[in-house]
């Protein structure tokens, strides 16, 4: 069965295992997620569980949003997302970090840091040209393609907005779960800036 939870990225730190191994970890704070709606094939055409995370002031919510969360007897939520293949949950129930345990393999989704307008070297990893000896080609994108089509093909590596994309890193290991602090420690780094929304769910391609 799939497990999933929403949280916020706190930052990175490092821990030592009992064997003395040094592990860099990302700290994810995941306060209890509230189930707002259970979608079924009969009512919605597909099966999913809609959860809400991070309370917000009622004055910031409109009347339909307040009525939607009132069915779960909870406060309006800042983030609302859906998880599929999750069973055994009812409207108003909570998903906590205790649903995960150390050693679980998960997929983590976040929004990568925005870098603004960048050139092809930083954005696509393109090699630069010679910097001396009369060269007039340094950090430019290079050839636009052959003459015959009379146009530039799609997906040509050019300068542009970099970052700010939805990124998923697969098969990350949960090192430790701290229920009293609503914290999950994940091995390695995860996409996103501090305080950004992070989605954690069971790995799709985990080794059987």
UniProtKB/Swiss-Prot annotation:
Gene3D superfamilies registered for this protein in UniProt: 3.30.160.810, Translation factors
GO (cellular component) term, any one: cytosolic large ribosomal subunit
Regions crossing the membrane: none
A GO biological-process term: translation
Molecular function GO labels: rRNA binding; structural constituent of ribosome
Coiled-coil regions listed: none
Alphabetical list of SUPFAM superfamilies matching this protein: Translation proteins
Entries under NCBIfam families matching the protein: L3_bact (TIGR03625)
Family that this chain belongs to: Belongs to the universal ribosomal protein uL3 family.
HAMAP family noted in UniProt: Ribosomal_uL3_B
Function recorded in the entry: One of the primary rRNA binding proteins, it binds directly near the 3'-end of the 23S rRNA, where it nucleates assembly of the 50S subunit.
This protein's name: Large ribosomal subunit protein uL3
Native organism: Streptococcus uberis (strain ATCC BAA-854 / 0140J)
């Amino acid at each position: 069965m799939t497990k999933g939870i929403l949280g916020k990225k706190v930052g990175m730190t490092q821990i030592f295992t009992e064997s003395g191994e040094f592990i860099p970890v990302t700290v994810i704070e995941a306060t209890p997620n509230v189930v707002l709606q259970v979608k079924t094939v009969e009512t919605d055409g597909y099966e999913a569980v809609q959860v809400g995370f991070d309370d917000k002031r009622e004055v910031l919510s409109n009347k339909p949003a307040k009525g939607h969360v009132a069915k779960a007897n909870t406060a309006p939520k800042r983030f609302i997302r859906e998880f599929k293949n999750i069973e055994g949950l009812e409207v108003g129930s909570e998903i906590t970090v205790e649903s995960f345990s150390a050693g679980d393999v998960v997929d983590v989704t976040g929004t990568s840091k925005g870098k603004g307008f960048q050139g092809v070297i930083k954005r696509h990893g393109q090699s630069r040209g010679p910097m001396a000896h009369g060269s007039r080609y340094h950090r430019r994108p290079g050839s636009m393609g052959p003459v015959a089509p009379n146009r530039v093909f799609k997906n040509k590596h050019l300068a542009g907005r970099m970052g700010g994309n939805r990124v998923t890193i697969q098969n990350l290991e949960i090192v430790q779960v701290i229920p009293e602090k609503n914290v999950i420690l994940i091995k390695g780094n995860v996409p996103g800036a501090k305080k950004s929304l992070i989605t954690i769910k069971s790995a799709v391609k985990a080794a059987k």
